[in-house]
Amino acid sequence: MRDSIENISQLQKKLNDLQLENQILKNILDKAGLSYHKELSKLRQSGSKEAFDPEQGKRIIHPQAITENMANQFFSMFWGRQDVYAKRSVNKETGKAAYYPQCNNFWTNVCHKKIKDGINCKDCKNRSYKTITKKDILNHLQGNAYNASDVIGVYPLLSNGTCRFMVFDFDNHDKDAEEKDFANSDDTWVEEVESMREICVLNGIEPLVERSRSGRGAHVWIFFDKPIDASFVRKFGFALLDKGAEQINLKSFKYYDRMLPAQDSLPEDSAVGNLIALPLQGKALQDGNSAFIDGNWNAYPNQWETLFNKPRLSQEFLEEKIKEWSNTIDDIAANAAESDREKPWNRMQHFNKNDVEGKLHIILANGIYVDNCLLYTSPSPRD
C-alpha cells in the first residue's frame, strides 16, 4: 500500500514537472511568434482519415418524423425564455433576413410597424409577446416553409437573470450582411472557430460547433446542467477567452462577433436581450448547414445523438476553472514582474508585428489632437 502511494506521488510530481515544462515551452514559442496551434490540431486529427465531404447534406441521417418528445428534448438543450421568442422573416423587396419578436398585435391597427411612427417594439404600450409552443419548435425542426420563415430564435437570458447555455457567435453582423444570411466574406473565420474549439478542449470543455445556415459562419455552444447566473457565466466566458489568449497564438479574432448572453442582467427598459437563431433548421439541414460539425468540418451523420450526448457543465466546474485560471494568470504575472526587477537589463519585451493585424491609434489624454493630414502640408498660420 505504501509503495502504491509513493508511486502515485512520483507520478503526480512527474506530471506537474511536465505541465510546467509544457507551459514554459509554449511561452517561448509565443515570444518567438511561432504558432503551435495549427501543428497541434494536425497531430490530433492525424488519426482521422476522413477528408471534408462536399456532399454535407447527404451525410446526415434524417429521422422519419420529428416527434413532440424530440422537440421537448431539443428545447431542453436550448432553453431560452418561453414568454417571448423570435422568428425569421425575409423582406420581399430587399431580400434581407431579420428576426423579430412575435407579438399578438403584429400588423394590427395598434402596431407601430404598420403605423410607421418610429416607435420600437420595446417601447410599445400595446406590446403582447407570444409564448413559444411545441408547434413553433416542430415547425423549426421540420423546415417546411419555402423561405425558412419557420426558423426561430430564442433569448438566452432568462427573466430571472440566469441562463442554461452560452454561445460564441462567429457570424457576420456587419451592415447589409442580412442579404446573405449573415455569411462571412472570406475563410479566415474558419481558423478562428477552430481556435475557439481548441481553447475549449485544452481547458476540459467539450463544445458543440454548429455551422450556420449560411454555411459561412458558426456558433460554438456550451451547455449547463442547471440555470446559472448570467453575470457569472459571462465572467467565465471572458476568463476562458483570456486563458485561450495565453494558449493559442492567433493574429486576430475579428470574426468573433459576440458572446451570449450578451448582458449580465435584463435592462430596465423592458428589452428582452439578444437573441440567437437555433440550430437544426429543417430546410438548411438538407444542405448540411445549421448542423453540428466535427473537427474536419463534416456534419455528424446522427445530429440528434451528437446533441443529446454532449455533456453539460456544472456551476462547480465553472467556479473551479475561474479559480484555476486566476491563479495561473496571477502566477505568470508575478514571475514576470520578479524577473523584471532582478535582471531588467537581460530581459526584453518582444513584439512581433506579424502577430497582429490592423491599426492602433493612441491619443494623449488632455492634449491637443487634430486628425488632419493637411495640417502638415499647408503653410503655417500667421499671427
Language-model-derived ranges and their functions:
Residues S4, Q19, I28, R44-S46, ...:
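Secondary-structure boundary/capping micro-motif
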Residues R2, G57-R216, F223-A239:
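Signature for HUH/AEP ssDNA processing cores
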Residues Y376-D383:
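Conserved small/polar residues in nucleotide/adenosyl-binding loops
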Residues H37-I66, S326-H350:
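Intrinsically disordered, low-complexity linkers and terminal tails enriched in Pro/Gly
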Residues V151-V190, E194, D225-I368:
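DNA replication initiation modules
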